[in-house]
């Protein structure tokens, strides 16, 4: 399906849409919660999905990984067969990384 992202407070869910809440599915947290690391004095953020690597098969994979920080949202799309990891530039000191599993929904980690 389609996803709509709303940044900021007091944003209403559009009619006909369902609001996703991160980390609420009954699935293995160690394979879904993003792990965030910074590199090069904090100027690069590395995000990977799971402390145990998530599968990347056509029937079960991470569709995208996103960084929400400093009022912006950057989304990196993945396909089956790709490692569930990516890099973000910018050096944000705080933020939230989201990952979307095609079977188990939305997951997040704040740093």
Segments from the language model and where they lie:
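Cysteine-rich micro-motifs
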Residues: 8-21
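Proline/serine/threonine-rich low-complexity linkers at boundaries of modular beta-sandwich domains
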Residues: 21-32
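Surface-exposed loop/edge segments in extracytoplasmic proteins
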Residues: 69-77, 107
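Short acidic/polar inter-strand loop motif in beta-rich domains
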Residues: 102-110
């Amino acid at each position: 399906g389609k996803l709509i992202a709303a940044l900021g407070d007091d944003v209403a869910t559009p009619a006909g849409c369902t609001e996703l809440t991160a980390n609420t599915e009954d699935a293995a947290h160690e394979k879904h919660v993003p792990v965030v690391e910074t590199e090069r004095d904090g100027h690069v953020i590395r995000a990977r999905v799971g402390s145990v690597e998530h599968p990347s098969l056509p029937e079960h994979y991470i569709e995208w990984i996103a960084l929400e920080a400093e009022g912006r949202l950057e989304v990196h799309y993945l396909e089956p067969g790709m490692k569930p990891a990516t890099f973000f530039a910018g050096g944000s000191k705080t933020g939230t990384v989201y990952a979307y599993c095609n079977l188990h929904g939305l997951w997040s980690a704040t740093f």
